[in-house]
A protein has these predicted regions:
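Short, conserved micro-motifs composed of acidic
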Residues: 29-308
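Bacterial Sec-dependent N-terminal signal peptides
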Residues: 1-31
């Protein structure tokens, strides 16, 4: 006779309930992200980039750098500043959807920027000066005050965590001095307690100049980099795919509609549903804006070209 059949039944019921909860939560997220209220209620772009939420984000100064949406699409984070290369007057803001409308922007951090979620969204990483990582910890429906999290004797720029727990960053941890931006490479880092191991992503995507502005896909299948950067910071957005041996393919351009003439392009980010690419574009501070463009179709076509 089977022992404790009731216990097996209870466990089966719990597993079923949890599975249904995950399915319902996933459907709810997808439902909101496809609703008219999603993305601050903005009309979705096609394959031609357009300014995201014009007039809604900057009350003074400029908006720039990486943005981040929560997985359910109901919280939006972005950076602001007075000038490109001055952290005075800079910081990070949050806009939340309250169930009926998007609330007004709220400052959640000062002088630290470039928000990036941990995979479980319990942490929001922010950077300062290219060499420090700060973190906000999830507390109920809000966030803790910024807490200092990591600093090394080398650069920790554009810090992002993939689903695997591997961190990606722009860094000169394998060469040069912390203040020498020309020695920064696209790198990955593993952290175990107080031990860190950092390595370059290789010569396929790195150059002898500064390499630090990027977006890594959560599953690490591709990386979007700011490439061909000039001494006056003009750059283009290119993509590289990770190979089976964990090396990277030769980068290729995201095309003339995104790389339309000389401009500084950085802060690249792909939305949680994979549909849209966000990035900052400007020829100077006077025309610096966050843009967005449909990305999933472009990504699929680039993958197909790589496979052919």
């Amino acid at each position: 006779m089977e022992k404790f059949p009731q216990l097996k039944l209870v466990n089966a019921c719990l597993i079923f309930i949890l599975s249904m909860h995950l399915i319902v939560s996933s459907c709810a997220q997808k439902s909101f992200l496809s609703s008219k209220a999603a993305y601050l209620g903005q009309t979705s772009p096609g394959n031609t980039p357009k300014i995201f939420a014009p007039g809604m984000l900057a009350d003074s100064g400029i908006v720039l750098g990486k943005v981040a949406f929560s997985g359910d699409g109901k919280s939006f984070y972005y950076s602001f500043a007075r000038h490109w290369f001055d952290d005075n007057g800079s910081g990070t803001k949050e806009i939340r959807f309250d169930g009926k409308k998007w609330q007004k922007p709220n400052v959640i951090a000062e002088k630290i920027t470039n928000p990036a979620f941990s995979p479980d969204e319990t942490k929001l990483y922010l950077g300062a000066g290219g060499g420090q990582v700060w973190v906000l910890n999830k507390m109920g429906q809000g966030w803790s005050k910024p807490q200092f999290w990591l600093e090394k004797n080398y650069g920790l720029y554009n810090f992002q965590e993939a689903n695997s727990g591997t961190f990606y960053l722009g860094s000169n941890g394998i060469q040069g001095s912390k203040s020498d931006w020309s020695t920064y490479d696209f790198c990955k880092m593993t952290i175990a307690g107080t031990d860190t191991i950092i390595s370059s992503l290789g010569t396929a995507i790195n150059t002898p100049a500064f390499d630090g502005d990027f977006f890594i896909a959560p599953d690490e299948s591709y990386i979007i980099i700011s490439a061909k950067e000039t001494p006056t910071y003009e750059s283009e957005l290119w993509i590289s795919f990770r190979k089976a041996d964990e090396s990277w393919s030769s980068p290729r351009s995201l095309g003339p509609k995104i790389n339309d003439g000389l401009a500084h392009r950085f802060g690249q980010y792909v939305s949680p549903d994979g549909k849209y690419l966000f990035y900052t574009r400007g020829t100077g501070e006077q025309d610096c804006n966050i843009y967005w463009v449909r990305f999933d179709v472009l990504l699929n076509s680039l993958k197909k070209e790589m496979a052919d």
